[in-house]
Every structure is written in C-alpha cells, then in structure tokens.
Amino acid sequence: MSINLYLIGIGFGDAKHVTEEAAKTIKSCNLILIGKKKDEKSEIADLKKNICKSFIKINSVKFKEFIIPERQLPNKKYINSVIDWHDDIAKTWVDIIKKYTSSTARRNINVGIPIWGDPSLYDSSQRIASRVKNTLHHTSIKLIPGLSSIQLLVSAFGIPFNEIGKSVLITTGRLLKERGWPDGTETIYVVLDGECSFTFLKDSNIYIWWAAYLGMKEQTLIKGEVPKIGKEIIKTRNTLRSDKGWILDVYKLQRLIRN
C-alpha cells in the first residue's frame, strides 16, 4: 500500500483563494484531516471543511476531525517543546491514517491536510509530515501551494510587497519581540503573533498595515503610524477574537523616512 500525503494550501477563508491544482488535489483525496485546538470553537474547523467540500461533488472523501495536542511549555526550552509537540501531532496523524487504511481495500491512499495560506511558509506542517513518512512505509509528501496571508494583505491594501532595492523580513511575533528590528531591514511581515508584538518596538517611526480575516466577510483592515494607531489595533483585535473565539491576522511594518 502506498500513501500520498498532501499539504494543501487553501488561502484564508474564501474558496476563491483555492488554486485549480489545490482543488484537483482535494477532489483526489480519500481522507482529509481537519485539526482543531482544544476548547476552540468549531467554526474554524468547519471553515476548512466547507472550503474542501465546495470542490467535492459526491460524498467520496472521508473527513476526520481531531484535537491538536497541546504544546507543553513548563520546564522546557522552546525548541524542545516544539519538537515534542510535533511528535505528538505526527502520532495523531499516523493513528488516524492507520485506522483508515485498515478499513479499506484501496492500495493507493491520498491523504489531504488543508493548510491556511501556503504550506511552504509553515515549517511545522512539513516537519510533522516528515515524521509521518518516517513511520508509515511507502509514504510520499507533496506540497500544494496556496495564496499566503502576505499576498492577500498587500492586495487588500493595494500596496507593493517591497520597496525598490530594499530588504524584506518575514518573521513571527515571538521573534520580533525577542530580537527587535534587525539592522538593514526596511520592511517586516509578521505572522503568528498573539501579542501585537509591534508594541514592543522602541522605534516610533514605523507604519503598520494590519489585517484580520482576510477574504472573509469579517475582513478588517487598519493602517497608520504605530504610535497613533497601535492601541486601536489592539482593541479591535481583542474585540474580534472575543466575538468569534479565534482570529487570523497578519501585518506589515515599514520604517518611515522623515524629511
């Protein structure tokens, strides 16, 4: 038996974000895994499932929801806790796939993992998939690209990705908070930030383009100089998260040149 494991980029909440290649891959899947965090509202998992279902005309795909194991932080270094966390998630994937393969006569199984944005930008899913491949014999991995939150952000605001001849950094909120603004960098894109880490930057000459729920009916856009608009972003983010129980957001930071 061979297993084809697809990490499928599905954009950010709108089926129109899904590429033709991703749609064809979804249709070809026998099993699609949908993860959700413990105590998380089902809406975010349902959103992923509904995006996938919009490309499936017959009930030929089995959807399996699972609770994503929690990452254990106390008494562990960050990297070690992430490694253990990936091991736990991989074991969950393996158990689900094994159970499915034991119940089917198929010799070739296509398993899909829908990923927000583009799977190439989130190394966790790739590392987890590699663990699955090492555990289950005759397993292959393929990434199916999707529209990333950064692409949707610059499109929503109608701004360029970069400045002419200037460098760009894509980082996480945790690293922005820990390391600050790197020398020689003019533009920063921040993902996976639950703390509005731009508030920890000491430089006041920074402009921000912040977006939440890109492509969804709740899409929210705020832009302005960080000292003037930062508190509004924090308040808006907290309100949106409280209302929906979850949030997907991203932002661009750029240093201002004062005359």
Q: Each predicted region: which residue ranges?
A:
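Flexible, charged surface loops at secondary-structure boundaries
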Residues: 1-2, 24-28, 105-106, 164, ...
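Class I S-adenosyl-L-methionine
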Residues: 2-139, 223, 229, 248-258
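General beta-strand structural signal in soluble alpha/beta enzymes
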Residues: 34, 113-115, 143-146, 163, ...
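A generic structural motif
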Residues: 63-68, 143-146, 209-217
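A polyampholytic, Gly/Pro-enriched intrinsically disordered region
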Residues: 81-92, 159-172, 228-243
